[in-house]
Amino acid sequence: MKKWWFNSMLSKGKGELEYRCWLSKSMESPGPIKNPSVSEELIRNDKNKNIHSSSDSDSSSYSKLAGVRDIHNFISDDTFFVKDSNRDSYSIYFDIENQILELDNAHSFLSELESSFYSFRNYSSRNNGSKSADPDSDRYMYDTKSSWNNHIHNCLDSYLHSQICIDSHVLSSSDNYSASYIYNFICSESESSNIQSSTNGSDLTISESSNESESSNESDVTQKYRHLWVQCENCYGLNYKKFLKSKMYLCEQCGYHLKMISSDRIDLLVDPGTWDPMDDDMVSIDPIEFDSEEEPYKNRIDSYQSKTGLTEAVQTGTGQLNGIPIAIGVMDFQFMGGSMGSVVGEKITRLIEYAANKFLPLLLVCASGGARMQEGSLSLMQMAKISSALYDYQSNKKLFYVSILTSPTTGGVTASFGMLGDIIIAEPNAYIAFAGKRVIEQTLNKTVPEGSQEAEYLFDKGLFDPIVPRNPLKGVLSELFLFHGRFPLNQN
């Protein structure tokens, strides 16, 4: 732990915190600490300077010795020995990770804060055109020590938000100027930060808001504006939904591949005006009459149909990819988690048979949670049916099949046609597994390593061929089809 010496003063005129600091010996090291940006001579000279009192703070100017470029690293876990304008000494302990602020022997500091808060409020009221600027006008409203402390707490919270600013004049040849706000680094680590401080046995707690109210407010805001924004599941940044399609559903903040609906994937891969859907009127008839206590299967199907505008969890058809005729099937995770029922299996099987008869290359985009439990063993049989059709397509007809694994691809889809492609392509960070992490851990009583079911880890194990981002995906597929003798229709 390092010791930092501060000369600090709260200016009465504008309520700003101005400072000078220098680094003294480390508590663990007997030798002097070298500061590459500050010379020892400057430190010695500055320590001998007089400290201006708060009475002439408006006209005083400070020669700031050392600037701070990264305040988070500067006060991540340090103790500061501070001397105020009255030459009273006290210490401040910062621990940003645990969100702790401790003040010792800080009577004069708190009184100076109090005075500064009044000055700050007067200054603000003058700027806002307030009629009253009497520093003692509100003091009598707080007739108990507890009320006054609460008022100080609120003022301190507001003060940290709006006023406490370290203006650091960094000594260098170019005489650069930088400004950093304390609050952004102390309190922005958590949206509901708590700064705990203790002064001679009394506890001073500053809370922006309680965790419960904060989380409930966030939930309300998310629900209210979810039609406008999509939250990234990786960095939790917000993406404007209107622009997502043009950006290929890539997070603007971190580039993470967000879930993409089947219609937009078709627009991404298929040339405009060439898409011809197949069997889009095929719907499930509830073959085993599955009725749950919450909602009957038929009602659930109707609900997803009205919500997504699709009849089932897969869209199949033909089109052109850079002029190359292809047969393509795209699964949609928004329709019952992309689960594979009898209709999904039948549509994919018919697509494969059509591609075999027309000698078309086949492209299947997988996004599924597995077999659909509401259809029992009939959904499991789709795995064998699709695999059988693919065997004829690949082995007997010698045609080219490419499967694309997106997030998530799990269960029966992984165990059947998802892993049968001549070329298996995965999207970055895609979740690919047979059984989910929780199922494995509860069944085998073993911990599944973090990230062991993601595309990058599985790629190292040889589970599929390339990992291709969405931006170059269409070009990569076009090159693969050209390599296998599939050429555009308009090429002589």
UniProtKB/Swiss-Prot annotation:
Zn finger intervals (C4-type): 232-254
Domain CoA carboxyltransferase N-terminal: 228-492
Residue ranges of the region described as Disordered: 198-219
Matches recorded under Gene3D superfamilies: 2-enoyl-CoA Hydratase, Chain A, domain 1
Domain of life of the source: Eukaryota
Catalysis performed (reactions): N(6)-carboxybiotinyl-L-lysyl-[protein] + acetyl-CoA = N(6)-biotinyl-L-lysyl-[protein] + malonyl-CoA
Keywords linked to the UniProt accession: ATP-binding, Chloroplast, Fatty acid biosynthesis, Fatty acid metabolism, Lipid biosynthesis, Lipid metabolism, Metal-binding, Nucleotide-binding, Plastid, Transferase, Zinc, Zinc-finger
Record-listed E.C. numbers: 2.1.3.15
InterPro entries: AcCoA_carboxyl_beta (IPR034733), Acetyl_CoA_COase_Trfase_b_su (IPR000438), ClpP/crotonase-like_dom_sf (IPR029045), COA_CT_N (IPR011762)
Pathway(s) the chain acts in: Lipid metabolism; malonyl-CoA biosynthesis; malonyl-CoA from acetyl-CoA: step 1/1
Cofactor note: Binds 1 zinc ion per subunit.
Cofactors (names): Zn(2+)
Family of this protein: Belongs to the AccD/PCCB family.
Protein name from the UniProt record: Acetyl-coenzyme A carboxylase carboxyl transferase subunit beta, chloroplastic
